């Protein structure tokens, strides 16, 4: 059978399955591909193909992740599923699999469990904006009232982590029945219903090019008679020649005008998200701008030194530390293009952090960096990566 060509005309959305071990995340992932394959919108992936996900290295961190793709009438989806709990933690913190929304799988027979809670918390911390729930193994619960209680418990749990628990779609079903091809309300129908909920409840993500302009400065040089050029890859938005931008981070914020945009030695009218450009800046001296700062649309981002973050600390096998660290730990934090020293405050009751742990920390940087919530960073010691993190909230 010839491979169906995915039409790229549909909006693209990244999603993933999250939830407690053995609640049926991988079975559900396989069932989605099976049911949609029946409509010619996916290639069926068996449980074992997904479960034996190859390990990938993302910024030195080993993560096992399965990627499947499929489409509905409305959209094209890239879906991630991880075999182990640790893989989810690493994936969500590093942003290796950036999710526009998640399908939370909860076993109706067990209700919410510790990892259910932890994945919801992580989703909140790392900025997964939308959650849809699949209440799996519903065929194992005969008592309708019990099902309603579990549903209520899930809604309350989601609300306690600032998700709109009352509005979130919860679809009851049996991923196993669907995978076995049973055409019933809890079987294939539940998968169709789930995908309808995902289609309608998770909005189209905002494209990088539609966001406010930002370019991390990688290099700076001066062109005699023309001025100072900052080079880098445009992270988001568009910059047009003649527009005002701010230089943010490290030093006091400065304003300037982009008088030229170059790419591959050619002059352009604008630079867009994804482009590697050189931006010619009016009235800026070579020493007034440096690597680690960003060029940004005025007022769109501000410099900060103190923030809360969710971090994963590499284990020894990943080339991380061999020993724990304690309160007052002072590594470098690598944001976009530069290292900044920061002091780590551990949460009350946490005496130390072991390699392989994930932890919520408060960080005080010695130099301000342009940041907003959701910004990823590496934790380094002398140029060696020992951890990864994401800004969960800004303090000052």
Swiss-Prot record:
Residues 136-139 are annotated as: G4. Keywords: Cytoplasm, Elongation factor, GTP-binding, Hydrolase, Magnesium, Metal-binding, Nucleotide-binding, Protein biosynthesis. It comes from the Bacteria. Residues 19-26 are annotated as: G1. One of its GO terms (molecular function) is GTPase activity. It is found in: Cytoplasm. It catalyses: GTP + H2O = GDP + phosphate + H(+). GTP binds at residues 19-26, 81-85, 136-139. The keyword Signal does not apply. Mg(2+) binds at residue 26. GTP hydrolase that promotes the GTP-dependent binding of aminoacyl-tRNA to the A-site of ribosomes during protein biosynthesis. Monomer. This is Elongation factor Tu. The gene is tuf1.
């Amino acid at each position: 059978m010839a491979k169906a060509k995915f039409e790229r005309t549909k909006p693209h959305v990244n999603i993933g399955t999250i939830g407690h071990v053995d609640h049926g995340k991988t079975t559900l992932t396989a069932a989605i591909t099976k049911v949609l394959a029946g409509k010619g919108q996916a290639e069926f992936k068996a449980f074992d193909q997904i479960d034996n996900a190859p390990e990938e290295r993302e910024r030195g961190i080993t993560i096992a992740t399965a990627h499947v793709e499929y489409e509905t009438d409305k959209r094209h989806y890239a879906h991630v599923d991880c075999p182990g709990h640790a893989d989810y933690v690493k994936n969500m913190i590093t942003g290796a699999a950036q999710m526009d929304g998640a399908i939370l799988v909860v076993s109706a027979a067990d209700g919410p469990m510790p990892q259910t809670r932890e994945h919801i918390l992580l989703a909140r911390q790392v900025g997964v904006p939308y959650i849809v729930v699949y209440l799996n193994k519903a065929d194992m619960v005969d008592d309708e009232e019990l099902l309603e209680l579990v549903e209520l418990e899930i809604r309350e749990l989601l609300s306690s982590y600032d998700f709109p628990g009352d509005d979130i779609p919860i679809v009851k079903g049996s991923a196993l029945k669907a995978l076995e091809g049973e055409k019933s309300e809890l079987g294939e129908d539940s998968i169709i219903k789930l995908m309808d909920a995902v289609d309608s409840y998770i909005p189209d993500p905002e494209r990088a090019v539609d966001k406010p302009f930002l370019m991390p400065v990688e290099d700076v040089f001066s062109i005699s008679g023309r001025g100072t050029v900052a080079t880098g890859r445009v992270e988001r938005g568009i910059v047009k020649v003649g527009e005002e931008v701010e230089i943010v981070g490290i030093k006091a914020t400065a304003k300037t005008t982009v008088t030229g945009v170059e790419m591959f030695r050619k002059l352009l009218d604008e630079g867009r998200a994804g482009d590697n450009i050189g931006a010619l800046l009016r009235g800026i001296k070579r020493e007034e701008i440096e690597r680690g700062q960003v060029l940004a649309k005025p007022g769109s981002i501000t410099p900060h030194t103190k923030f809360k973050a969710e971090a994963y600390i590499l284990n020894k096998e990943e080339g991380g530390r061999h020993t724990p660290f304690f309160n007052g730990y002072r590594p470098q934090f690598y944001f976009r293009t530069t290292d900044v020293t920061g002091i780590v405050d551990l949460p009350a009751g946490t005496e130390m952090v072991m390699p392989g742990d994930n932890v919520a920390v408060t960080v005080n940087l010695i130099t301000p960096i342009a940041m907003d919530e959701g910004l990823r960073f590496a934790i380094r010691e002398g140029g060696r990566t020992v951890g990864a993190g994401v800004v969960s909230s800004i303090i000052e």
